[in-house]
Amino acid sequence: PLIRSIFIPEKDCKWGIFDYSQQEPRLVVHYASLKNYMGASKFVDSYQEDDTTDFHQMVSDLADIPRKQAKTINLGLFYGMGKGKLMSQLGVDQETAEDLLAGYHERVPFVKKLMMDTMRKAGDKGFLSTIEGRRCRFDQWEPANEWGKKALPLADAQREYGEHMIKRAWTYKALNRLIQGSAADQTKKAMLELSKQGYLAHIQVHDELDFSVANDKD
């Protein structure tokens, strides 16, 4: 709110706020459907039939859990949250969290499939390509069998932890990097196209673009 308050519309204009509708869930569905993962086609069909489809509500209905819990789990998995943090966000104990996740993955299997696939690719190739072809690199390494050690460049990690005792770091964030990177591609591309038409955004906030809009009282 403080940063937004710095910006005001141009003279004789009003403030216009435009954002994507569930940009990141749609990207998850897009990538899962490209792989023909089980369950993704249901969401594709729903988006094609009704562009106001609420991803979180669909997951809520499928997994038979409240929408708030569905949204928390969705975003937690998209952003690479660990089980401990997800438990805290849900406000439940470990057993309940594990039951919720098990039910979620059984009824919405494509999210976990996509998460595991992106982790594997990041580990094998060292990068993922976003929807516009930018590379999200995973070029740091950590011990393969120890948690909490500092991630280092390859040569440093080999010296510190042993040449054959390391793995790529941060791969659990692979889905997050793919989805947020692709969302950034879409938003920046939209900003570029709009600027070519003479519409310059005053500020970008995540998936939102804010403009001065002619105050047409008619």
Predicted features, each with a name:
Residues P1-D218:
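Conserved catalytic core of nucleotide polymerization and phosphodiester-bond processing enzymes
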